[in-house]
Amino acid sequence: MHITKMHGLGNDYIYLNGLEGAPEDLPGLAVRLICIRPGRDGDFTMEMCNADGSRGAMCGNGIRCVGKYVYDKGLTRKTCLTIDTDAGPRVLELQVRGGRVEQVTVDMGIPALSPAVSVEAEGETYTVWPVDVGNPHGVVFCPAPEAVPLERVGPILEGSGAFPQRINVEFAAARTRERLDVRVWERGSGITLACGTGA
């Protein structure tokens, strides 16, 4: 089995070319794994597993790496791709220079917003704003994301009974009209350096 390690904004994944066969028990490998298979309706299919072995419907940084992977490995020469995911198809635009992908943008679709939910964790009440972009997120606006004990609060919010599917959690503070500071707890993976769908 040949693998490739890639990262998008610091989120690293192991990529497995499943176009010619791959293990059926992907969650059993228990790593942050993305398997690229033939497309159902699109050009390719992305199957994603979190570090704990749970299946992820969508990963923004992961799907950008899929675009780079399939182009740089010569599996396609298209610069506009449709990737099938468990959250539905996503369209990628690849910016190519000198035969290599330099940047990938993804149309994530329109996020679905829900009313805020209050959740208790570590003696504090957090106002969590549910947002769904193909996978569930909970955004908590706070003055200092860096001060939140993310390793303790993250798993409590992720697994709260208010969110039966579990959620990715982003603690965010608006610093200017153009800048947010964000810390991320991803369901099934824990603290990560970034989150494409959470952005």
Predicted regions and their residues:
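A glycine-rich beta-to-alpha transition motif near the start of alpha/beta enzyme domains, typified by
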Residues: 1-100, 139-199
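Short, solvent-exposed secondary-structure boundary/capping segments
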Residues: 100-108
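Short acidic-hydrophobic surface loop/beta-edge motif
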Residues: 4-6, 81-83, 116-123, 129-131
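Alpha/beta catalytic cores of group-transfer enzymes, especially the acyltransferase/condensing modules
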Residues: 111
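Glycine-rich, charged/polar anion/phosphate-binding loops
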Residues: 114-117, 124-127, 156-158, 168
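Internal active-site segments that recognize and position negatively charged phosphoryl groups
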Residues: 120-147
